[in-house]
Structures are given as structure tokens and as C-alpha cells.
């Protein structure tokens, strides 16, 4: 209990939950619906766009060790927050401005970059919260948070879709990204600086 309900563990779990909310809500659940409704996109086209997100994640993941030596983890998390905000904002405005689905690869790529920063950094930080013998407890809790986010985020962002259509999940995504930024700014452990 002292490990699970430790303040840093709760904060990091909250960040993990919110980051996965953006992934499983606006991106994985509602982007295919948007692509179908606005662009009549085929499943293969939607899959190709998602591949771009994977490329963004991979590009950052391959350079994360170098970035971690050059910049503090807190700064990287704030940069990821900016990426989330930019990606969600572009998803909100681009469909009204462009006629091709392929323009949406830009925000999807930027979102992939954000994922490539946040998920490894949060996982790495979580593993430092407990001695080796108790690390499985922390990681199991982290996995539970992930699954909870996976289950609840489509329902949560669906409220926005229900009230204002396809723009709803992305407007809510901007709000969630700003909450992530506020949590990182005020509470991300200073001890993670240039680890």
C-alpha cells in the first residue's frame, strides 16, 4: 500500500492514464470514424495513416537515450505535452481546410512523437519508485491503469462526439493535453533531471 499510494506513484499513474486516454480516445477510436465520414477512407488508407504514427514513435524512441542525456526528463515531458496539444489542434482544424486524408498524417505523426516521449519516460520513472523486489507491484499497477484508460477513454471522448460531432473528441483532447502539461509542470519529479 505504501508503494501504490505513494504520491509520486499516484501522479505518474495519473499521467499514464491521461496519455493513454489521448491514444485510445481521439486517435485509435475516433480517427477511423472521422476518416470514414469526412474522407470515405478505406481500412487500408486508415492503416497507412496509423503507420505514420508508429514511425513518429520509432523515430523518437531510437533517439531517446541521446535526448535524455541532453535534456531533463521534465523538459522532454513538457515537449511531449506541446506535441499532444499541436496534434489535437491540427486534428480539430485541418479537416475543414484540406480535402485529402493524407494531410492528417501530420498530426498523427506528431502524436506518435508525443507517445514516443511520454510512454518510455513514464515507464522508466515508475520502475524507480520501488525496490527491485517490489517492482512487479508497481508495474502491475501501471498495467492496470493502462487497461482502465483503454476501457474508459472511448466512452469519455464519445461524450464530445455525441454533442458536437467529430470535433468533440479533439477539443476534449486539447483539454486533456493541457491537464497533462499542468501536472508535469507542477508535479513531475525534479530528481528525474538528466538521469
Question: Where do the PLM segments sit?
Answer:
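Juxtamembrane intracellular "pre-TM" segments in multi-pass secondary transporters
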Residues: 1-14
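Short amphipathic helix-loop junctions that connect adjacent transmembrane helices
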Residues: 29-44
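Interfacial helix-cap and linker-helix signal at transmembrane-aqueous boundaries
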Residues: 35-36, 67-68, 159-165
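Helix-to-loop junctions at the C-terminal end of transmembrane segments
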Residues: 60-73, 161
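C-terminal ends and interior cores of transmembrane alpha-helices
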Residues: 83-97
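Intracellular juxtamembrane helix-capping segments at the cytosolic ends
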Residues: 117-130
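A late C-terminal transmembrane helix in Major Facilitator Superfamily
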Residues: 129-163
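A membrane-interface helix-boundary motif in multi-pass transporters
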Residues: 159-177
Amino acid at each position: 500500500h505504501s508503494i501504490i499510494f505513494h504520491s509520486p506513484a499516484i501522479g505518474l499513474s495519473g499521467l499514464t492514464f491521461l496519455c493513454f486516454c489521448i491514444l485510445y480516445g481521439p486517435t485509435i477510436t475516433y480517427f477511423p470514424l472521422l476518416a470514414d465520414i469526412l474522407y470515405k477512407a478505406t481500412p487500408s488508407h486508415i492503416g497507412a495513416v496509423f503507420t505514420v504514427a508508429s514511425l513518429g514513435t520509432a523515430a523518437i524512441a531510437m533517439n531517446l537515450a541521446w535526448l535524455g542525456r541532453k535534456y531533463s526528463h521534465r523538459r522532454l515531458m513538457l515537449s511531449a505535452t506541446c506535441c499532444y496539444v499541436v496534434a489535437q489542434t491540427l486534428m480539430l482544424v485541418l479537416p475543414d481546410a484540406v480535402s485529402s486524408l493524407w494531410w492528417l498524417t501530420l498530426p498523427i505523426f506528431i502524436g506518435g512523437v508525443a507517445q514516443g516521449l511520454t510512454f518510455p519516460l513514464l515507464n522508466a520513472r515508475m520502475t524507480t519508485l520501488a525496490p527491485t523486489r517490489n517492482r512487479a507491484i508497481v508495474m502491475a499497477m501501471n498495467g492496470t491503469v493502462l487497461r482502465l484508460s483503454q476501457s474508459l477513454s472511448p466512452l469519455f471522448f464519445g461524450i464530445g462526439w455525441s454533442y458536437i460531432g467529430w470535433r468533440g473528441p479533439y477539443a476534449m483532447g486539447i483539454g486533456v493535453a493541457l491537464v497533462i502539461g499542468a501536472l508535469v509542470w507542477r508535479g513531475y519529479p525534479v530528481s528525474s533531471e538528466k538521469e
